[in-house]
Regions:
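Short helix/loop segment immediately N-terminal to the Walker
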Residues: 180-195
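N-terminal helicase ATP-binding lobe
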Residues: 34-50, 61-84, 202, 209-213, ...
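P-loop NTPase catalytic phosphate-binding loop
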Residues: 2-4, 56-181, 202-255, 259-262, ...
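Conserved ATP-driven motor cores of ASCE-family P-loop NTPases powering translocation/secretion/packaging/pilus
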Residues: 15-24, 238-315
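Long, basic/Gly/Ser/Thr-rich N-terminal segments
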Residues: 1-58
Length: 317
């Protein structure tokens, strides 16, 4: 808490709050991580003295982000018994509370490496449909694990490829409607997750026939808006998530946002539009960046991220 005494010679505003954040975050590192707020956070104090009845509050957590190191990913997954997905040493994600996830990052930042980790951990707890426009590591992972994958074929155009994706998305939307009817009859009905994984979303929407692109966006929008209660989830990967890659309404439904690689005002503007990354201590190295988990368990503020380091079967990555 920072308790200003009024009247004061300085203005108590957002600029003051951010200056104190910069000082406190550097001074408390690495024992504590001060969580970045988009604007000043005031709380009332239990006192009758009007001069000190309010304080600036700075949310924080003990320690700093630490990378998880897994010597054998397959063995690690087989030993797991819960739906928790470990992200870092002191951060796990309950997949039952996930609606949609997004992983963004520039080329070579480690997006595919992070995606392979999530795919391996999701396989025991979710059905998977993988869309891989690059025909790269997600396809190799899917082949090894015998999972459905949609990838480009030599004798088909890009519009044919996106039309095939639309057909699968339409089937998933029908599944949502079926599950909604089942929930209407029995509100306690439990479903297994169905996760639709789309790598390089931007590659699908750019240069595609407008009617097919509009149908693709419409299906994505409906699945993102309706899939939460019926456990139909999206896991989207792209270099950036501007309005050309996914509709704004889909981006607003994302409750796990991951930005990997170079962090600055331009790179975070789509997943974290209100965030000024100044002052956030982001470690150097591959697979580092920011993560935001929006649920009732984690602080909604953005946290520094170090993606797990793991070892898996040769030939997948």
């Amino acid at each position: 808490l920072f308790i200003p005494r009024l009247p004061s010679s300085y203005v108590i505003d957002d600029a003051l709050y951010q200056k104190i954040f910069l000082i406190a975050n550097a001074a408390l590192y690495p024992r504590y991580t001060v969580l970045k707020q988009n604007s000043a956070y005031f709380i009332p104090l239990n006192t009758e003295d009007i001069h000190v009845q309010r304080a600036l509050f700075f949310p924080w957590k003990v320690g700093i982000s630490k990378r998880l190191v897994i010597s054998d990913l397959e063995q690690f997954v087989s030993a797991k018994t819960s739906r928790l997905i470990p992200i870092m040493e002191n951060l796990s994600l309950d997949y039952d509370k996930v609606t949609s996830m997004a992983i963004a990052g520039n080329s070579g930042s480690g997006k595919s490496y992070a995606l392979t980790y999530f795919l391996t951990l999701l396989k025991p707890i979710s059905e998977l449909i993988i869309v891989d426009p690059k025909f790269d590591s997600p396809s190799r992972w899917a082949k090894y694990h015998q999972v459905t994958v949609i990838h480009p074929k030599q004798n088909r155009s890009k519009s044919d490829f996106v039309s095939e994706i639309n057909e699968v998305l339409s089937q998933s939307l029908q599944l949502i409607y079926q599950r909604q009817a089942m929930l209407y009859e029995n509100p306690n009905q439990k479903f297994k997750h169905l996760t639709i994984v789309i790598d390089e979303v931007l590659a699908l929407s750019e240069g595609t026939n407008k009617a097919i692109k509009d149908a693709f966006f419409s299906l994505l929008r409906q699945i993102a808006l309706l899939g939460r209660a019926t456990k139909v989830d999206l896991l989207l990967v792209s270099q950036r998530f501007d309005y050309n890659s996914i509709p704004v309404s889909v981006r607003e439904q994302l409750n796990v946002n991951i930005q990997i690689g170079n962090i600055n005002h331009k790179t975070v503007q789509f997943l974290f539009p209100d965030l000024n990354p100044e002052g956030i201590v982001i470690p150097i190295g591959k697979g580092t960046g920011l993560i935001q988990i929006i649920d009732n368990e984690h602080p909604y503020q953005v946290l520094p991220l170090l993606c797990p380091t793991y070892y898996t079967k040769k030939g997948i990555l």
